[in-house]
Amino acid sequence: MKKNVASVIVDILQNSGVKHCYGIVGDTLNYVTDAIHESKMEWIHVRHEEVGGFAAGAESFISGQLTACAGSCGPGSLHFINGLYESHRNGAPVILIASQLDTNTTDSSFPQYVDFKSVYSECSVFCEEIISPDKAIEVTKNAVSAALSQKGVAVIILPVNISKSEIDYPNKIAVNYHQPRIIPAQGDIKALADVLNKGKKIGIYAGIGSKDARGALLQLAEKLKAPIAHTSRAKDFIEYDNPYNVGMTGMIGIESGFTMLKNCDTLLLLGTDFAWPQFFPEKATIVQVDINLENIGKRHPVNLGLNGDVNETLLQLLPLIDNKTDDDFLRKSVDLHKKTLEKISWLEKGAKAHVIHPQYLAQLLDKHADSDAIFTADGGSAMVWMLRYINTNGQRRTLTSLKHGTMANAMPQALGLKKAFPNRQVISMSGDGGLAMLLGDLLTMTQEKLAAKIVIINNKSLNFVELEQKVEGLLNNYTDLENPDFGKLASALGMFGESVESPEALEDAVIRFLNYNGPAVLNVHTSPNELVMPPNVELNSVVGMGLYTAKAVLHGRSEEAISLIVDNFIRK
């Protein structure tokens, strides 16, 4: 049977599990979009290709399924770059069909020509051009296999003349991939058991590589009487119903997670590529298990490293572990976690404050959201409030830009997740700067009938950048934002829109917003002076904040300094 190359690519992708393709149409993409129209795959028409990259990556990451996006030649496919960088760093298998000019006109001086192979080489696991029609099946199969096996973005560059060329095609081709079992040698597992059995104050630090090892992890913690801290990417899998949980560490962590890691004498790292060595203990014995060999000892020296799947390794390890009886370190760590959560809670006092604190907003969302809701958050302060205050329960999921650290990811990711999970509540915690960057794709919500809920943390500034400037002792420069009334703007676009400025009105507004049957925007005016306090405040940060306060007064900006002190420390 003969089919054109575009139809062959679409057929292979569909047979390999792709349900949705995000993008904007263009002339070099016409045969691809025609093939999608004739298939069971759905086309999601975004207003900016970057949004398509974010959306496809979010769908893939949370669903575990291969997803696609497609763009026209030149600027069209180039616009995907930041969204796909995020997806690639997050380990989301996504296929990009980057359509290209006719093979006879691909030189660097020709209008709209872009060398996609050079552009996408750093943010993909596979990037190849189909140089002749007979290579279409091979390239497409290799792209799918690479995306699934290596967990990343695969790029198929498709010249327009090749897309419409016909080739012989069998009835059905699909690529199926199964993850192999990787288990360390028995001698290495025995050595790991010896280290853990000798430890007195053992701590476990679990990353996203532990997501399938929850049962074995809790059994190990019980035997070792070991508290468990977790990375932000492991929150969904480790945090809930966990009597050993002490929370996160790092810049966006909390006191109990930070303290446990600093005070343990033996630290077991499980499936984590945590990047900040200053949060590791200074004198502890550190052992590590990771399925990726390159991660072992990458961020901090370790005494013993095992290359293997975390769950498979723990199942082999458990019979070799002694049942410890001294639970003093565990008990103190868990007690501190409970006190830390009580200390940072705003549920009781938030409505009585003189401004809306974003922590209170986050806790109200946590209180009233569905038990299986999916949350996204923009990189920056919105990310901190989501990770600290949204509680997981084994059903909820959270997603933000942790490895790439981009702005403007939350709303696009929410669109992709609502498309993938139409019956689940999807809530985006967007910064005002992040949302404004890709504001046009609110129209995608109405056009595609995607009933996502967009909360805007409107502090009228690039808040996280402003905080970084203040910690350095600098005046906050060029971070102010002149925002429209996002509530009225949403209403003008045909969706629910409401703005809230008073703390006492916030809870009712959150309930109305979440219960609305359709796309909705809640514009919440939060304190512009809120500090994202790390779990451990260093002296240089205190000095820097003091310098900022002094400079603000000297430059006639004393009102800013006073507001910062009142909002964060006096909290009237």
Residue spans of the language-model regions?
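Glycine-rich, anion-gripping cofactor-binding loops and their flanking helix/strand elements
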Residues: 61, 208-289, 393-424, 436-440, ...
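Aromatic-enriched
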Residues: 160-187, 345
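N-terminal cofactor/phosphate-binding cores enriched in small/glycine residues
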Residues: 2-85, 89-90
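Glycine-rich, acidic loop regions that bind phosphate or pyrophosphate groups
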Residues: 98-138, 234-333, 510, 514
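Structural signature of the thiamine diphosphate
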Residues: 2, 19-20, 61-71, 75-98, ...
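Thiamine diphosphate
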Residues: 97, 105-112, 297-299, 305-307, ...
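Phosphate/pyrophosphate-binding active-site segments
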Residues: 4, 134, 158, 169-171, ...
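Active-site diphosphate/adenylate-binding microenvironment
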Residues: 6-9, 17-19, 24-27, 32-33, ...
